[in-house]
């Protein structure tokens, strides 16, 4: 396979001269760092190569070093951009402040203006549509529960079989297959949720996009608008998007004929149809709209479910109490959206896992669109990228023995009137920023919660699970991301007991 280093640019002398000009600009006109200390900025590291490498392999240690200074804000060079890291105490003040832009902070990092990585609406619509579409989906979750449960059952039976013998399975592959099938059912209906070609695209798009972004970001920013045309990961991503179009557009045409028909018929919710009607004739790319939503939805939910399953492998003492809760709650009330809300121990295990092992160690990214003076006098210069330190999740006053995993932690907190408001999994707080906070909080967290609980219900009632002997599933940290090892395995077998059938 072609490597990035093997690509030769024409006129290397021109490139070299351009780099010298940039170096001169840096030396003559250094960036305004304000009065904030920098944790990993080094003299003569003009292109921040050393700083970025340090962050890539020691991000958590660098973040902790900044917190140990006792300052409420400090600068940290990451492998993406330099962030002003703020302690979580500022999250409540900033969460809805329009002087800080969320999309303005994320879009340049994700290179959304490059073909294959782009947004899908002209003008400002491209950032308005995904949250609107997901919020519309949230209203349908109560009706979708039995359908999502059916897809979870189908996927698990296909991948894990009904074998009563212990056999090893991949945790990441299982979870990704489940999320792909269930989320496609939620977004696009029954037409595509078992389509192998579409599911392959849905499962791999997020990873392929991340690889393409990393490939482009390895080049200087002034070359990125051109170099992406020649990079193999970008070309492969554009081919995959075209394959997705070939699958989605015929489905969209059928949706259009249905909702434009003079015959009023009751139709299932379709994200394709919702976005098409929301556009009201505006030019947009229906395929990129769906892929953008999928890229976010899959990452959040897959990361959560993988880590919860890994925790259960490490804490098998939780499996039977969780199973008994499912039997008690779902056996009495049936498998409905409202009964999922009553699985408080399961929700506690999920939230405790997310508290200790969020997908990213910093969060709630914003860009200061103007100079901002906070209430305590802290001045944030215009153009500053900010992120929050996620430090309150280790506050011992809020979470006794915060470094220790306690699956019952949030269930016990429900008994404390002063802390009960912190317990719902989908509730955002400055002490728990895994889903963000404020008006830009992740709108897909409700779907993620329901999908995670449904998956766990099916696993707990139908299978025995355990860690592979001598090889417990472990996490792998890289930069700001903390993910389950892609090679993580577990052992499973079909249970003999069958308390009741999971159905709506």
Curated annotation (Swiss-Prot):
Main location: membrane
EC number from the UniProt entry: 1.14.14.119
Recorded metabolic or biological pathway in which this protein acts: Mycotoxin biosynthesis
Transmembrane segments: 9-29
Presence of the UniProt keyword Iron in the record: yes
Function: Cytochrome P450 monooxygenase; part of the gene cluster that mediates the biosynthesis of fumitremorgins, indole alkaloids that carry not only intriguing chemical structures, but also interesting biological and pharmacological activities. The biosynthesis of fumitremorgin-type alkaloids begins by condensation of the two amino acids L-tryptophan and L-proline to brevianamide F, catalyzed by the non-ribosomal peptide synthetase ftmPS/ftmA.
Family: Belongs to the cytochrome P450 family.
Name recorded for this polypeptide: Fumitremorgin C monooxygenase
Organism: Neosartorya fischeri (strain ATCC 1020 / DSM 3700 / CBS 544.65 / FGSC A1164 / JCM 1740 / NRRL 181 / WB 181) (Aspergillus fischerianus)
């Amino acid at each position: 396979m072609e490597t990035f280093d093997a690509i030769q640019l024409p006129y290397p002398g021109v490139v070299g001269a351009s780099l010298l000009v940039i170096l001169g600009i840096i030396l003559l006109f250094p960036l305004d760092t304000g009065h904030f200390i920098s944790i990993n900025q080094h003299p003569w590291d003009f292109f921040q190569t050393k700083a970025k490498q340090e962050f890539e392999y020691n991000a958590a240690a660098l973040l902790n070093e900044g917190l140990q200074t006792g300052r409420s804000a400090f600068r940290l060079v990451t492998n993406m951009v330099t962030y002003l890291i703020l302690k979580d105490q500022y999250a409540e003040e900033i969460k809805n402040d329009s002087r800080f832009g969320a999309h303005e902070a994320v879009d340049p990092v994700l290179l959304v203006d490059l073909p294959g990585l782009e947004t899908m609406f002209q003008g400002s619509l491209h950032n308005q549509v995904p949250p609107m579409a997901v919020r519309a989906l949230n209203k349908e979750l109560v009706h979708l529960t039995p359908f999502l449960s059916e897809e979870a059952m189908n996927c698990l039976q296909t991948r894990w079989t009904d074998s009563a013998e212990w056999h090893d399975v991949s945790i990441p592959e299982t979870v990704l297959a489940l999320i792909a099938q269930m989320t496609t059912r939620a977004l696009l209906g029954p037409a595509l949720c078992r389509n192998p070609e579409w599911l392959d695209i849905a499962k791999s798009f997020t990873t392929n996009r991340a690889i393409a972004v990393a490939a482009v970001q390895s080049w200087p920013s002034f070359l990125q608008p051109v170099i992406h045309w020649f990079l193999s990961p970008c070309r492969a991503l554009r081919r995959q998007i075209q394959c997705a179009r070939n699958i989605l557009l015929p489905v969209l045409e059928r949706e259009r004929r249905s909702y434009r028909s003079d015959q009023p018929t009751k139709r299932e919710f379709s994200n394709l149809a919702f976005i098409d009607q929301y556009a009201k004739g505006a030019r947009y790319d229906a395929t990129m709209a769906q892929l953008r939503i999928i890229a976010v939805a899959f990452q959040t939910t897959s990361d959560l479910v993988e880590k919860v399953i890994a925790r259960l492998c490490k804490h098998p003492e939780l499996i039977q109490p969780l199973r008994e809760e499912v039997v008690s709650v779902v056996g009495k009330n049936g498998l409905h959206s409202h009964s999922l809300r009553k699985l408080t121990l399961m929700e506690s295990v999920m939230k405790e896992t997310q508290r200790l092992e969020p997908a990213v160690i910093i969060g709630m990214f914003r860009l200061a669109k103007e100079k901002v003076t906070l209430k305590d006098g802290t001045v944030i210069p215009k153009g500053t990228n900010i992120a929050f330190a996620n430090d309150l999740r280790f506050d011992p006053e809020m979470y006794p023995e915060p470094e220790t995993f306690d699956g019952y932690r949030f269930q016990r907190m429900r008994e404390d009137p002063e802390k009960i408001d912190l317990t719902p999994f989908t509730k955002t707080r400055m002490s728990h920023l895994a889903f963000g906070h404020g008006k830009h909080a992740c709108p897909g967290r409700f779907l993620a919660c329901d999908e995670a609980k449904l998956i766990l219900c099916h696993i707990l009632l139908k299978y025995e699970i355990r860690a592979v002997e001598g090889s417990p599933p472990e996490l792998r940290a890289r930069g700001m991301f903390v993910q389950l090892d892609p090679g993580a395995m577990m052992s499973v077998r079909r249970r003999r007991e069958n308390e009741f059938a999971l159905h709506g």
